[in-house]
């Protein structure tokens, strides 16, 4: 049903790569970029209300529409008949692809993807785990899901078990070794790219991806990064406006002109940056895992230190 999948990791350039692949005539990219079909651990019935507001599922109205379905970023597809609909116009010589970044983390995806799709290729971008976690934190802060400092939120997040839709998983999604080991034994053809190398030379990276997928070579569609991060000045106020019933009511009843001014005023003038002390502290969560990953991959990852 699917020929190749971009399996992760979140905040590591997967949306940019998916955007490039969508422009390739040899690829039929899914109408839902991240359908999460093979990650059975992800259950919207158990997601927090705040998480669901940021990451809503595709509802019955969406599926009632005729093909081709409108493009959307994410859903939690469980029915095979619905999963098949996300490639309505795939040609016989096109690769059917999707880009669920939950898959690298998901044991069920590593177990079931290759079993259901013999010969499937799995592509993963791995990023410096501290930078990945910090980028994830900035996104969560922008959406009002956290309001503490990066280290405070990383400490809090790492103290519990990973649970998609209930926690942010800043730490868990930056621990790569177990997932890499699972996917190496999954039966899928695993292709691994290092984010820092890939986007330092995007033209060479794009050529490598096309070769790995058996695609004819075309020029890089664009060099711009998709979904660049923005920061907010007042994360507690953002959380109130987006997730408290009164805040949502007030925002919903604002005149559009006032709402646009409020949004502009809420943006921080400068991006958040890690201090050296914060980076050193955060690295302690990931150092042992990176050392283990080096052994599994058989390569040096000192570019992350």
Which residues does each predicted region cover?
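PAPS-dependent sulfotransferase catalytic domain
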Residues: 75-89, 144-221
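Canonical radical SAM enzyme core domain
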Residues: 127-130, 199-200
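The conserved 3'-phosphoadenosine-5'-phosphosulfate
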Residues: 32-33, 181-280, 298-305
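Surface-exposed cleft-lining segments at the edges of enzyme active sites
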Residues: 68-70, 96-101, 158-172, 229, ...
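ATP-dependent NMP and nucleoside kinases share a basic, alpha-helical "lid"
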Residues: 105-123
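Short N-terminal helix/helix-N-cap motif within the alpha/beta-hydrolase-1
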Residues: 105-108, 134, 203
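Generic structural signal for small/hydrophobic residues in well-ordered secondary structure
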Residues: 13-14, 83, 97, 113, ...
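PAPS-dependent sulfotransferase catalytic core
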Residues: 1-94, 99-100, 116, 129-135, ...
């Amino acid at each position: 049903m699917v020929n190749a999948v971009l399996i992760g990791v979140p905040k590591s350039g997967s949306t940019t790569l998916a955007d490039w692949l969508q422009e390739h005539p040899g690829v039929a990219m899914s109408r839902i970029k991240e359908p999460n079909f093979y990650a059975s651990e992800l259950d919207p019935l158990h997601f927090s209300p705040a998480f669901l507001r940021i990451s809503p599922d595709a509802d019955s109205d969406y599926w009632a529409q005729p093909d081709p379905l409108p493009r959307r970023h994410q859903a939690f597809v469980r029915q095979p008949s619905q999963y098949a609909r996300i490639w309505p116009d795939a040609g016989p010589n096109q690769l059917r692809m999707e880009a669920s970044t939950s898959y690298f983390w998901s044991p069920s995806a590593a177990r079931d993807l290759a079993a259901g799709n013999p010969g499937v290729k799995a592509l993963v971008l791995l990023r410096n785990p501290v930078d990945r976690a910090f980028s994830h934190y900035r996104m969560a802060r922008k959406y009002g899901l956290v309001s503490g400092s990066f280290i405070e939120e990383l400490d809090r997040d790492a103290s519990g078990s990973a649970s998609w839709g209930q926690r942010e998983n800043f730490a868990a999604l930056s621990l790569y070794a177990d997932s890499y080991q699972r996917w190496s034994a999954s039966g899928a053809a695993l292709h691994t790219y290092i984010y820092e190398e890939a986007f330092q030379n995007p033209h060479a990276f794009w050529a490598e991806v096309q070769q790995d997928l058996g695609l004819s070579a075309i020029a890089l569609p664009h060099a711009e990064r998709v979904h660049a991060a923005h920061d907010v000045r007042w994360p507690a106020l953002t959380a109130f406006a987006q997730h408290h019933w009164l805040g949502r009511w007030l925002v919903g009843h604002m005149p559009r002109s006032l709402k646009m001014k409020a949004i502009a005023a809420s943006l921080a003038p400068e991006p958040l940056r890690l201090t050296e002390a914060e980076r050193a502290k955060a690295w302690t969560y990931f150092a042992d895992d990176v050392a283990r990953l080096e052994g599994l991959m058989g390569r040096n990852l000192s570019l992350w230190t």
